[in-house]
Amino acid sequence: MTINKLESRNDKEAIAEEITILTKLLDDATKTMVGSASFDKITLFKKLSIEEKHQELEREIEQLTNEEMVVVSRYFSILPLLINISEDVNLAYEINYQNNNDIDYLGKLSATIELVSSQKNAQEILENVNVVPVLTAHPTQVQRKTMLDLTNHIHELLRKYRDVKAGSINKQKWYDDMRRYVELIMQTDIIREKKLKVTNEITNVMEYYNSSLIKGVTKLITEYKHLSHQKGFDLGNAKPITMGMWIGGDRDGNPFVTAETLKISALVQNEVILNYYIDKVSDLYRTFSLSTSLSTISNAVKEMADRSTDVSIYREKEPYRKAFHYIQSRLQETLIYLKNNHLEELESEDSAQILPYQSAQEFRNDLQLIKDSLLENNGSAFITGDLTELLQAVDVFGFFLASIDMRQDSSVHETCVAELLASANIVANYSDLPEEEKIAILLKELTEDPRILSATHVEKSEILQKELAIFKTARKLKDALGEDVIKQHIISHTESISDMFELAIMLKEVGLVDTDKARVQIVPLFETIEDLDNSREIMRQYLNYDIVKKWIAANHNYQEIMLGYSDSNKDGGYLSSGWALYKAQNELTEIGYDNGVKITFFHGRGGTVGRGGGPSYEAITSQPFGSIKDRIRLTEQGEVIGNKYGNKDVAYYNLEMLVSATLDRMVTRRIVNSDNLVNYRLIMDEIVADSNLIYRDLVFGNEHFYDYFFAASPIREVSSLNIGSRPAARKTITEISGLRAIPWVFSWSQNRIMFPGWYGVGSAFKHFIDKDEKNLTKLQEMYQSWPFFHSLLSNVDMVLSKSNMNIAFEYAKLCQDEETKEVFATILDEWQLTKNVILAIESHKQLLEDNSYLKASLDYRLPYFNVLNYIQIELIKRQRRGELGENLENLIHITINGVATGLRNSG
């Protein structure tokens, strides 16, 4: 596909006009709060930033009092937020315009299905493809829900601006409404006073389902089937997209995730989807006013109508309405039953009363009876629309909404299994045994001994009790809400086969694993570069065990593997991580093929390039050919969720991109000469080995690097920011390796170095180019012909464009000694070298030369939110001197929020 991206067609003039209006409203609101004299300083800061008079700007900010800092920090934090809204509104407008006028754009579903339909196995491809965005609550979503609600109001008002210009909406009323919400934002706390709880995170993410995701997913699948039907394909129960959830089940490094939070997550999701069904059935009740005087119904619908408690005389001749009333009553009873009885299985007793549905399938069957009755009695015109979409929603969301993943660190499983084996007098020192002996013991317990190890009366440790409670809750959830409510358990830091069998032992304890099947799929997560390298041999051996073959066969021959982008990047740098992931996918796919197993990948990507982020379409289509069979899962993290799914139009577009990119990659083999590809891989091996050494020499080999990072970034302030339930580190931070990848990347974004997205790239390429004058031409050829390499370098280009070494230099001044400051000199040299080399390989004269949309976006915002960095630096200085006071420390957090908002992909 060579069609342009939809974003590239955004109306830049319209965005600029709207930003001007929003800026004036913010200016007026600020003047009202502080007066013209104080506001003049804000005007001066904007002028100095635009003119790039950095030293003068820094001096002026140093003169601000703490009280003046409050308003200035808020102003420059809110301005990029308003710019984001304008861009999102225009993207939504462009999406609707392109679709309504049947204009093609990159990733458009109709064009993609046209492409797939030409394949010999098109029916199989279209029927089986499944993309799963998994929403997570990593600590990168810095906005309060209150602020999100207010911005949604502004978003909706801005959508109406074109009507205002056309004169169909009163301009003054529109302006007054907009001013009110801007003033509300200016006077609302931007950050949270208290750290989020897991239950808060669950509730927050449900807002996206209510506002956009349920409708977006349902609409997309309905359209997908319609377009496929036009091409002659009947897809039946195809689910090209389903949703996943980590919140409530991801306890790796998060002690606040328990059996109770897992249950709450499932029940909250159940409540959300049941309420959606109730509302939709209510809509159908109002719509289906068909009278028996004018139409006929089936006996099955008549029986439903007769059981309805709607006894109004006005309904005597409206059996469809009575049938929908009966269905709605059963849904309400289901909701009440699950709320009151929690995870007890649904029971049916007296057939005369309104009883809860025992399953989503039972609910669907009732809807199908109505559809069948309409088809049989000349009512086919009433089927399309709400009824069809509701049936589709039930197929996708069931009574569970999104499948919850469980995740835990492998060391926790080992600790628990060691305790179980010791308490059952099987082996006293399991953890000390060599790998072969561990596997032998675990296999014996899994294949030969049906007993439950935890049944002994020996007192259990707190960690074992907690883990067993979670697994027992998972079993109850599956029994009550269906198998799909929890399908995977991920093992962080998978380093051996025993890591996977240890989880199997824990699952066996609660009846989720036996010799024939695993009701919860065991998913290894390979994170570091070393683990990725070792993953081939681990999986090659694991797939050959008879019990594993049975588990996989019971799972339709699929085995999922999760790939960690964040830790591999922190471990070896951007190039090393990207190449290790690429090779691992290639080789793991081949291992699966050799064993008759479909290996599917779960991509643990973050919002930033340093954590595997970047444009979703390009990321998926640049995966190794053959690595996407028909299923792919990927995490959607932090503020990326809000950016992608904050409103229904943009949500639909991003879901469409995921499905189209996956289908495109499944059927399109980008032509790369096989001999060339072998050569390309050898070149990458050489460059990556060099890049890894350069990266690790600084991060882990330079004795001053640790001190530099903690002095020249707001890492301590980020760690104390109330932006998620998870701690910033698994333990007390004494070295870089102990820091979680997310705050690591977040902090480098704040000081504008964007270190994880490019360091080690420039020198490695330069060394290769200097070896032979023809090597630059080879790299340019690779960039033009190899999608993986093109995507890799395009992401570096994007990261460099968001970095700012002038600002980074000011952060470096926060270091206390010259040796530590020298670390920045090394970073600066590498940054300049990387920029030069990337431009040379791309044959470009400037960064973002082929990304006009992002370039325009940065042009709007950079002059304004650059000011925030200088404010943040001054605030950090004052805090470290003890001059801020406890009541003003949150000012730093406000600036952190603003920078993250301006960059739009903080972690």
From Swiss-Prot:
EC numbers: 4.1.1.31
Gene Ontology biological-process entries: carbon fixation; oxaloacetate metabolic process; tricarboxylic acid cycle
Keywords: Carbon dioxide fixation, Lyase, Magnesium
Recorded coiled-coil stretches: none
Catalytic residues (UniProt): H138, K570
Signal sequence extent: none
GO cellular component annotations of the record: cytosol
Pfam family, one: PEPcase
Cofactor(s) the protein requires to work: Mg(2+)
InterPro entries the record matches: PEP_COase (IPR021135), PEP_COase_bac/pln-type (IPR022805), PEP_COase_Lys_AS (IPR018129), PEPCASE_His_AS (IPR033129), Pyrv/PenolPyrv_kinase-like_dom (IPR015813)
Single GO molecular function: phosphoenolpyruvate carboxylase activity
Catalytic reactions on record: oxaloacetate + phosphate = phosphoenolpyruvate + hydrogencarbonate
Family of this protein: Belongs to the PEPCase type 1 family.
Functional summary from the UniProt entry: Forms oxaloacetate, a four-carbon dicarboxylic acid source for the tricarboxylic acid cycle.
Xref: HAMAP family: PEPcase_type1
Protein name, as recorded: Phosphoenolpyruvate carboxylase
Taxonomic placement: Bacteria, Bacillati, Bacillota, Bacilli, Lactobacillales
